[in-house]
Amino acid sequence: MEEGGRDKAPVQPQQSPAAALGGTDEKPSGKERRDAGDKDKEQELSEEDKQLQDELEMLVERLGEKDTSLYRPALEELRRQIRSSTTSMTSVPKPLKFLRPHYGKLKEIYENMAPGENKRFAADIISVLAMTMSGERECLKYRLVGSQEELASWGHEYVRHLAGEVAKEWQELDDAEKVQREPLLTLVKEIIPYNMAHNAEHEACDLLMEIEQVDMLEKDIDENAYAKVCLYLTSCVNYVPEPENSALLRCALGVFRKFSRFPEALRLALMLNDMELVEDIFTSCKDVVVQKQMAFMLGRHGVFLELSEDVEEYEDLTEIMSNVQLNSNFLALARELDIMEPKVPDDIYKTHLENNRFGGSGSQVDSARMNLASSFVNGFVNAAFGQDKLLTDDGNKWLYKNKDHGMLSAAASLGMILLWDVDGGLTQIDKYLYSSEDYIKSGALLACGIVNSGVRNECDPALALLSDYVLHNSNTMRLGSIFGLGLAYAGSNREDVLTLLLPVMGDSKSSMEVAGVTALACGMIAVGSCNGDVTSTILQTIMEKSETELKDTYARWLPLGLGLNHLGKGEAIEAILAALEVVSEPFRSFANTLVDVCAYAGSGNVLKVQQLLHICSEHFDSKEKEEDKDKKEKKDKDKKEAPADMGAHQGVAVLGIALIAMGEEIGAEMALRTFGHLLRYGEPTLRRAVPLALALISVSNPRLNILDTLSKFSHDADPEVSYNSIFAMGMVGSGTNNARLAAMLRQLAQYHAKDPNNLFMVRLAQGLTHLGKGTLTLCPYHSDRQLMSQVAVAGLLTVLVSFLDVRNIILGKSHYVLYGLVAAMQPRMLVTFDEELRPLPVSVRVGQAVDVVGQAGKPKTITGFQTHTTPVLLAHGERAELATEEFLPVTPILEGFVILRKNPNYDL
C-alpha cells in the first residue's frame, strides 16, 4: 500500500499495534486502538476472537465430560480450527494461542482416555500444541503415539519443529538403543520428502546430517532439487570433521551420478582425491562430448588416466588430458587480446616514470645482480608466449651478462618463455646443451624440464634428455637436470622417473643442495600419493646425515619432499612423525611441523591451526644470551647454518596456518587477523614468515588490506622481513597487472635504489605482477575455488619454504628455486569450443561470484557483470555465465576450456 493510502478508505486491513501484540487481524475502531494500551489483554479481543476462544474452551470442556460419543466431533472440530487458521509467519496461530492455557488439561484428558482411535487423535492435537510450549520434546512424544496421519496436513512450521526435536532425541539415544531409533527413522522418512517438495532442501540435509543418515537423501531427490542439495552438501564440507566430510562428498557424488551429471561428479571425486572413482566416473560416461569436457577438467587438475586404446576417440581424449593443446589455445587468447608483442624488463620497470634527479635508476650500473633480476622478469612477463627480446634471438649475448649461477637461472628462463610448447620449445633450447659453460648447460636442462611442465608427451622428451645428467660428475649439472625432471613430471607419480632420481639422494658425490633438490623433485613427482619408496629414501637420507649436515640450510628441502609426498593426506603421516623422533633438535621440530602442515594442506582443519598457534607462541630466550658470547667466534660459521636456531619451525608453523586455512574464506579471514598480531609481537623468525603466509593465503588476489600490510613491512628494520614482504607483494598480485601494486613497487624501487638485495626483490615482484602479461595466475584453486591443485601447491610451497632463509637461498646461489612457481602457473582464461573442439566465440557475462547456497528459487549467481565475447580472462573471485540461450555448457562451471552444445529448445 502506498504512503498516501492511509488517509483513504481502508482497502486492505493494516495490522494495528494491538494486532501485533495480540495477533488479531481485525482492525479495531480508533477508540479501541487508543484504549488498547491501558486495557487488560483479555479485553483486547475482538468479537470474533472472543467467539473463537469460547468455542475452543467449550470443545476442551466437552472432552472432559463423561460422554465419549462427543469426543470424536470435538476433536474433529479442534483439528479443523487449528488447520484452518492460516496465519502470518510471524505470529502464533490463534487457536494454538487460545489453547495454550488448556495444554495441561488436554494432557490429563489424554491420559484418562481409553486406548483407541480417539486417544491417538487427541495425541495428534497435543503434538501440534506442544509446538507452542517449550516442553521436553512433547511434540515428538505425542506424534509418535498419535494416529500417524500425513505430516503435511499440519503445515511447514510443525514439520520444522518436529525435525528439530527428532535430531535432539537421536543424539541422546546410544547406538545400543537401535529399537528406539526405528520410530524416529520412520518419521524422518516422512519429513524428508515433505521438505524436498516444499523448497526446504537444506533443512532436509541438516536433519540427515544431524542423525548421520545422509545416504537416505538419494532416493527422495528429484530433477529440480538435486543441484541445490549438492551445492548445500558441498558447502558444508568445510565445516564438518573427518570422516563426515568425505561422507557428504560421496553422497553428493552419488546424487550427481543418479542424474548422470558426470562433470560435477568428477569434480567431487577429485575433491576426494580418489583416483579409482575418477576413472570409474570417466569410463562409465558414454557421451563422448561429456568425456572430452571431463578430460579438459582432468588436464587442468593435472591428472592423467591411462585409457584403454579401444575407447572411442582415444587419441582426442588422451591429447586433451595431456594438455598438448594448452600452448596453442593460450596463444590464440593472446592474439585475441592483442598482447603478442614481446616485452622487455624496462617496459615493466617503467624507469622513465621514476623521478630521479640524476636520470633513471636503471642506467647507472649494469650489475650481474640486476641482469639476473631482468632474466627472471623477462621470463615471468613473456611466460608461455614463445618469444622475447633477450633470449630467443641471440641468447648468448644476454647469458654472458650473468655470472656463474646467474647463467643457470638466465638459461632456464628460456624454458619459461617457451612454456608448454614441447615440440617447438626444445629445439630452441637444444643449442645451449652444447655450451662449454656447465652453468648454461645446467640451465638449459632445467629449461627442458620447465617446458614440459604440466604437459604430457608420448615420447617423454624430458626424461630422455635429462636422465643422463642426474648422476653427472658436476653437481651443477645434477641440479638443473633433477629440478627439471621434478617440474616436468610433477604430480605424475611416474615410477621410472622416481627410480632414476631416488639413488641420487644417497650418492656420496651429491652435495647437501643436490640431495635437497632431489627430495624436492621426488616430492613434486609423487605429490599427495604417499609413495612408499620416496618416504623411505628421504627418511633414510635424513637419518644418515650428521648433525652438522642437517644444519645446512638446504637440509630444509628433505622434510619438504616428505611433506609434499603426503600433501593433504591427513592422518597418514603418523608413522613418519614417529620415525622422525630419532633425529636431533632443532631439525626434528622443523621436519615434524613441515610434514604435519603439508598433510593438512587446504583442509581448513581448525584444531591443527590451534596447535600451530601454540608453536608460534613459544619463546626461546636462554639460547639468545649464550649466542651473544659466541657471536665473535661464530661469525664465519654462521653463513651456512641457518636453520640451526631453535625457532626455525615457528616460521614453518606460520606458513602452515596459511596453508591449512587457504581452503575456505572464513578460516582465511581469521588467519589474517592472527598474522597481524604475529607481525607486531612475534619473534624474528615468525615475522619473517608472516609476509610469506600472507602471500600464500591470497595468491593472485591483490586485496587492498593485504597489500597495505605488506607495503608497510617492505620498509621494516629487519631486512629479511622487507625482502619477504616485497616478494609477497608480487605473489599476491601475480598475473593481475594491478595498477596500484605496480605503482607501489615503482616507489619501492626508488626507495631501495641503492640496496641491491631489496631492489632484486622489487624487480622479482614487478615481474610476477605482470606474469604472462597479466594472463596467468598462480592460484592453486580452480573450478570456482573448489578444487586445490596439488601440483600448484607443491610449487608454491617449494618457493615459500626456501624464502624462510631468503638470504642464503634466494639471494645466495639457489635462486633457480623460483622456477618452482612454474608448477603453479595456469592461464586464467575461459575458452569455449563447439562439440568438434573448434573455438566458438559466444557472449558471456563475467561478474563477481555470489554465494547462493541455501537460497530459495533461482537466485543470480553473479553481480556487477560485464558482457564479453570468449575467449575472456577471469579474475580472482569472478564467475562467468553464458549470455545466450543458444548454447548449453556441458559443465556448469565456466572456467578454462568449456565445450558448448546447441540448445535443442532454442528458437531462432
Swiss-Prot record:
Coiled coil: none annotated. GO terms for biological process: proteasome-mediated ubiquitin-dependent protein catabolic process; regulation of protein catabolic process. The modification N-acetylmethionine is found at residue 1. Residues 1-52, 623-645 are annotated as: Disordered. The modification Phosphothreonine is found at residue 24. The keyword Acetylation applies. The modification Phosphoserine is found at residues 16, 29, 147, 361, 363. SUPFAM superfamilies: ARM repeat. Keywords: Acetylation, Phosphoprotein, Proteasome, Repeat. The modification N6-acetyllysine is found at residue 551. Residues 708-903 are annotated as: Required for interaction with UBLCP1. GO terms for molecular function: enzyme regulator activity. Residues 10-20 have a biased composition (Low complexity). Component of the 19S proteasome regulatory particle complex. The 26S proteasome consists of a 20S core particle (CP) and two 19S regulatory subunits (RP). The regulatory particle is made of a lid composed of 9 subunits, a base containing 6 ATPases and few additional components including PSMD2. Interacts with RPGRIP1L. Interacts with CRY1 in a KDM8-dependent manner. This is 26S proteasome non-ATPase regulatory subunit 2. The lineage of its organism: Eukaryota, Metazoa, Chordata, Craniata, Vertebrata.
